[in-house]
């Protein structure tokens, strides 16, 4: 008999029903469960697949460069970044008819095009690219890197080049190489690029491979470095009247500490960023030499962790046993990596708009909105994934004997206290926040807005004042002109920073009031509830009072039959599934808040947000309804406009989202009956019955149907908001 899919599981391959296909897809990446898997093959497969992942990433970024060079308007955008709309790529087949062709022909293009809202134009411009030839060169280089990654992946699957398990478990060497190599050397290389290429380009000097060795990045060359006069590199920075990309008002400094933003581009000073990356490189190059490898010097991770025993013995055996637990569990390592990456991605979202690094991106409002929303959603998915793999660790990899009385065991032992405290916090936040919103709503409805309960966020305002914001009248730390910190920084970074923080046109430390206080607590409710579900799912993954033997049932099980009535919906997978809905809703509130606050800031009517955000009807009417009106008019009886594609996506997003409920609110029996009826009809219909299949059609399992429902809910939800966000912002600001 020919080998059937899935080859990695003979048990599944012999399944006579369509379950074979769906379970095969579902477990394709669960290498641990495959036939004939060994620890060595598991590590080698994952390692090789990383190269494939890198190849895809480089191919994708190469494609971005290539399409902009081929079909974009980069060179004309560079001449006037504030008024030319950047083109992502052409549209081959604009729907529908001549009005569509006219609506989508913009940005100086000859035919219909898509506008870029990704910020790549600003990024490439900032790092020194200026011509289409530069873009083509970059695309070709990344294509080469992609091919090398693929070859490396293939190579590391060959017997001679397969690394051993001991190589994968050499934590110190990996840490040293990742700290020094990945972060240290790459930051140093980036500093080099900024100093040798990007900063000269910002001053009108075109440095490429042909003149790279002839152009001094600084008039003094390397002299100050070797004589210890490093301050010379900071002297004569670009002036406030500097025109980016020209020598007008340009200085000669390469490593500065100016603070604040370049007045014309509204982005951080390039010389400040070069300085920052040099400092990061220095720190990480040192950090990458701290762990003991072949040379017998430096820290041993195991010794470090074993020494971490809290004094007085009140917290048990501290970190004893953690080294082997983490080093032998891929799920634990993945959980840690995802948790870190998720937090970093969310921080990227927060910093990209408040401290823009790329020239002119702050004035491209749609791009700012798109990048913030994109990074927050990505962060949400990554963070929920961290808890999912944490739960799988507890089920598959956790060894109670190895972790006796250490921090991990103690987390499990007092999980009731953790879960109940989180539950209390969520209930408190939810009822109080909703109570305030509903009260204010009723007061507005009855025409007595003065009876609203409006709470000033005085603690947050105090923190903003401590960082130098003067408008609240707190005379504290950096907002106090006679403090030591203020005086110490007056000649260095502070003037730029204080100008930026008190300038009302940027997004640095926005002025906050009662509307912000309320939505902040609504978001806190969402964060705490999402965390509650995820933490409970992981801590109860091995077992609970209700189901002490839960770990024997694995990560995702629907129920343990009718005999134990209460065991449905309590697998660790179910917790993840529920948490994703909460995560999506929470990030919905986060992005609504960010977007509305910024729309009013950009339009110069901040009072609309301040007055309408304190009650629910204000959010529904003055944010959602008001901003979707243009979107809903993408198609109308008079034809179409450039927003029509977003109008279509808005409708389509709702359709996908609603389809999710079809899977979420009906279970196996219904579908099984339906499938059997359809199969019966198919077999008795002429022509149709010429098509036969080997597998008996059966309904999806409960867990799989939930996954399909969740996928549709998530994709539809994000599609809908993406269309709303881009259309409402670009419709207002072009």
From Swiss-Prot:
Query: What are the GO MF terms of this UniProt record?
Result: 4 iron, 4 sulfur cluster binding; chlorophyll binding; electron transfer activity; magnesium ion binding; oxidoreductase activity
| Positions with a binding annotation for chlorophyll a B1 | 654
**InterPro entries per record:** PSI_PsaA/B, PSI_PsaA/B_CS, PSI_PsaA/B_sf, PSI_PsaB
Membrane protein topology class: Multi-pass membrane protein
Which terms are listed as keywords in the entry?
4Fe-4S, Chlorophyll, Chloroplast, Chromophore, Electron transport, Iron, Iron-sulfur, Magnesium, Membrane, Metal-binding, Oxidoreductase, Photosynthesis, Photosystem I, Plastid, Thylakoid, Transmembrane, Transmembrane helix, Transport
GO-annotated cellular components: chloroplast thylakoid membrane; photosystem I
Q: Which domain of life is it from?
A: Eukaryota
The record's listing under Gene3D superfamilies reads:
Photosystem I PsaA/PsaB (1.20.1130.10)
Its annotated compartments are:
Plastid, Chloroplast thylakoid membrane
Q: How is the cofactor bound?
A: P700 is a chlorophyll a/chlorophyll a' dimer, A0 is one or more chlorophyll a, A1 is one or both phylloquinones and FX is a shared 4Fe-4S iron-sulfur center.
Gene Ontology BP annotations: photosynthesis
Q: Where does [4Fe-4S] cluster bind?
A: 559, 568
SUPFAM superfamilies documented for this protein: Photosystem I subunits PsaA/PsaB
Q: Which residues, by range, are in coiled-coil regions?
A: none
Keyword tRNA processing annotated: no
Tell me where the transmembrane regions lie: 46-69, 135-158, 175-199, 273-291, 330-353, 369-395, 417-439, 517-535, 575-596, 643-665, 707-727
Binding site residues for phylloquinone? 671
Catalytic activity, per the record? reduced [plastocyanin] + hnu + oxidized [2Fe-2S]-[ferredoxin] = oxidized [plastocyanin] + reduced [2Fe-2S]-[ferredoxin]
One Pfam assignment: PsaA_PsaB
Q: How does it assemble?
A: The PsaA/B heterodimer binds the P700 chlorophyll special pair and subsequent electron acceptors. PSI consists of a core antenna complex that captures photons, and an electron transfer chain that converts photonic excitation into a charge separation. The eukaryotic PSI reaction center is composed of at least 11 subunits.
Name the HAMAP family for this protein: PSI_PsaB
Name it.
Answer: Photosystem I P700 chlorophyll a apoprotein A2
Organism of this sequence: Lactuca sativa (Garden lettuce)
